[in-house]
Swiss-Prot record:
Binding residues annotated for FMN, in chain numbering: 62-65, 93, 122, 186, 216, 267-269, 288-289
GO cellular component: cytoplasm
Cited Pfam families: FMN_dh
Sequence positions that bind Mg(2+): 157
Subunit structure: Homooctamer. Dimer of tetramers.
Catalytic activity from the UniProt record: isopentenyl diphosphate = dimethylallyl diphosphate
Subcellular location: Cytoplasm
Binding-site residues for substrate, renumbered to this chain: 6-7, 93-95, 156
Name of the protein in question: Isopentenyl-diphosphate delta-isomerase
Principal location listed in the UniProt entry: cytoplasm
Cofactor(s) of this protein: FMN; NADPH; Mg(2+)
Keywords: Cytoplasm, Flavoprotein, FMN, Isomerase, Isoprene biosynthesis, Magnesium, Metal-binding, NADP
Family statement drawn from the similarity comment of this UniProt entry: Belongs to the IPP isomerase type 2 family.
Protein encoded by which gene: fni
Length: 357
C-alpha cells in the first residue's frame, strides 16, 4: 500500500505547503499589445479540436491524482467541471490501481462524469518499461481514454528513498510500443530539451507535454515527505533540486523546433499564460495546482477557475488582434530575462518571436 499512501501524502502536501518554484518564467514573456486590434472581442474564437473532440479552449486539466479513496471526490469534481466547460482532463498516475484494482473507480469516475471531453490516461515510463506495452491498454481501458500520457519523473524518483531510478531502455520501450491511441510524453516539472524531443519525434512520438519548471516542484514535494519521515538528508536534497530543470517557455520552443506537437504546462496560472504558450508554439496548455484546492471544495469552484482562464485567454486574444488560435500563434511575443538568456545560450534568436506576423 506504499503507492496508495504516497498519493494521499502528495495531495496533502500540495494543499498545505509551498511547493511552487520561486522563478516564474512566464513573467519573462510580453505579448505585444495592439492599441488598434481592428477586431471586436465578439470576433474572438477560443475553440479548438484536440484528440478528435471539440473544446471550448486549448486547455487541459493536467494530471493530478487518483489511486486513493479520498482522491475519488477530487477527480469527480474535476471531471464534472471539465464536462461543463468543455475542457480536456488528464488523470494522475494509474499505477496504484494496477497494483490494487479496487481503486480503479478513483480513476474511472472521470470518464463517467466527463463523457464528451478528451480524457488522458497516465502511467510512468518506468512501469511501461517493466510491464511492456500491454500496460497502455490496461490504463486506457480503465478510463476509456482518448490518449495515454507516459510520464517522466526521474528527478522525483531520485529524491524518493523508495524511488525507481531505472531510466535505461525507456526510449526503446516507447519506440516498440505500438498502441491504438496517441501517446503523450509528459515530464513532471523539469521540462524536455530539444535533444530528447528530437529522439522522441524520431521514435514516432508526436505529442509532448513539456511540464517545465516554473510551477509545482515535485522535488520540493518529496522534500516535505522526507521531513514527515524524519529523513533530513532526503529533505535537504529535495530542496537543493527544487529549481532543477528547464523553464516551461524554453522547453516549449525547443520541443516545437524538434517537430513535436507541444502541450505547455508547468507554471500555467492564467489565461494570459495560455496565450503566451500558444504564441511560443504550443497548441494546448495544461494547469493542475490552481485547480486542486477548488476541487476539494466542489465542481462549482473548479468551473469558476476554468471560466476565468478562458475569459483571460479571450481578452489576451482580443488585445493582440487575434481572432483565432492560429492567429494567436503568429502574435509577436517579446522574450526577456532569464528565459531570453537561456534561449540565446542554446543558439535560438529570440527576435524571431518579437517580429512575427
Amino acid at each position: 500500500m506504499e503507492t496508495v499512501r504516497r498519493k494521499l501524502e502528495h495531495i496533502e502536501i500540495c494543499l498545505k505547503k509551498e511547493v511552487v518554484s520561486k522563478y516564474r518564467p512566464f513573467d519573462d514573456l510580453i505579448l505585444l499589445h495592439r492599441a488598434l486590434p481592428e477586431i471586436d472581442e465578439s470576433d474572438v474564437c477560443t475553440e479548438c479540436t484536440f484528440l478528435n473532440r471539440r473544446l471550448s479552449a486549448p486547455l487541459i486539466i493536467s494530471a493530478m491524482t487518483g489511486g486513493h479513496p479520498d482522491a475519488r471526490e477530487i477527480n469527480a469534481n474535476l471531471a464534472t467541471a471539465a464536462q461543463e466547460t468543455g475542457i480536456a482532463i488528464g488523470v494522475g498516475s494509474q499505477r496504484a490501481a494496477l497494483e490494487h484494482p479496487d481503486l480503479e473507480d478513483t480513476f474511472s469516475v472521470v470518464r463517467e462524469l466527463a463523457p464528451d471531453v478528451p480524457v488522458i490516461g497516465n502511467i510512468g515510463a518506468v512501469q511501461l518499461h517493466r510491464y511492456g506495452p500491454e500496460v497502455l491498454d490496461r490504463v486506457a481501458e480503465m478510463v476509456d481514454a482518448d490518449a495515454v500520457a507516459v510520464h517522466l519523473n526521474f528527478l522525483q524518483e531520485s529524491v524518493q528513498p523508495e524511488g525507481e531510478r531505472h531510466a535505461a531502455g525507456v526510449l526503446g520501450s516507447l519506440r516498440e510500443a505500438r498502441f491504438r491511441l496517441p501517446i503523450i510524453i509528459k515530464e513532471t516539472g523539469c521540462g524536455i530539451p530539444f535533444e530528447d524531443a528530437r529522439m522522441l519525434v524520431d521514435s514516432g512520438i508526436q505529442l509532448i507535454d513539456v511540464a517545465g519548471t516554473g510551477g509545482t516542484s515535485w522535488s520540493m514535494v518529496e522534500s516535505y515527505r522526507a521531513e514527515l519521515r524524519g529523513d533530513p538528508e532526503s529533505k535537504e536534497i529535495g530542496m537543493l533540486f527544487a529549481e532543477w530543470g528547464i523553464p516551461t517557455p524554453v522547453s516549449v520552443i525547443e520541443c516545437s523546433r524538434a517537430g513535436a506537437q507541444v502541450i505547455s504546462s508547468g507554471g500555467v496560472r492564467s489565461g494570459i499564460d495560455v496565450a503566451r504558450s500558444i504564441a511560443l508554439g504550443a497548441f494546448m496548455a495544461g494547469a493542475a495546482l490552481p485547480l486542486l484546492a477548488p476541487a476539494t471544495r466542489g465542481s462549482v469552484d473548479v468551473v469558476r477557475v476554468l471560466q476565468r482562464f478562458v475569459r483571460e485567454l479571450r481578452i489576451s486574444m482580443f488585445l493582440t488582434g487575434s481572432r483565432s488560435l492560429q492567429e494567436l500563434s503568429r502574435a509577436p511575443v517579446i522574450i526577456t530575462g532569464r528565459t531570453r538568456e537561456i534561449l540565446e545560450q542554446r543558439g535560438i534568436d529570440t527576435k524571431i518571436f518579437s517580429s512575427k506576423r
